[in-house]
């Protein structure tokens, strides 16, 4: 989780958010096993200092699943040496942020060597059961229609409704999608996009910008980034965040549904 100074909507531990996120992703993959078997899906968890009991719960959730999966450790010592100590606001970068920046960097390095599509997910996004299927089918449809690769965010962020702005509306599988110019660090894209803009992506992990995701937003000026209406996944951050709870979603029901 990125630096979070305000209380989240539900009073639970970080691990509880992570476990419910993982559970929702597994359920979403199970919702169309034939599709995700054909796509040779692999789920990788990059862990940093989770308690043994939490790791055991990860393993229990992933046991005997039809898709490949792996839990690896964050190599923070390797990545943190590339991070500047002072951020854009002139403040010292926190240890928590160093961990997050290192995790994103390691995720991007793994993504470079994927076969095709890659989905980077922060550990506080709980998914609807049809989320990943919709993302795959919508990517195929829209990418083919436009003749280019895309970037897709699963959340319908509240900030999108704070002001009037022009957007492109596209038809996915069962959802409408619209163009956006900002996101957080959870998105699906292709290996081609990752490699094309790798240096810009990684710059997010070497210097703490303001906003943090500014290099991503710069990429969206060159590549189409879209998000669904309504959301396919909800970012369970504090209730007042413009990047938090998506509108028109029963987020309490979604939270309870993914209780272990």
Predicted regions located by residue number:
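Short loop/turn segments at strand-loop or loop-helix junctions that form parts
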Residues: 1-5, 47-48, 71-82, 154-157, ...
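Short, flexible/disordered intra-domain loops and linkers
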Residues: 2-17, 91-96, 201-207
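Short, acidic, metal-binding catalytic loop of nucleotide-sugar glycosyltransferases
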Residues: 9-39
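Active-site-proximal specificity loops/subdomain of glycosyltransferases
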Residues: 47-115
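Conserved catalytic core of nucleotide-sugar-dependent glycosyltransferases
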Residues: 86-87, 111, 117, 128-200
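The conserved acidic donor/metal-binding loop of glycosyltransferases
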Residues: 123-126
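C-terminal catalytic/acceptor-binding lobe
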Residues: 191-260
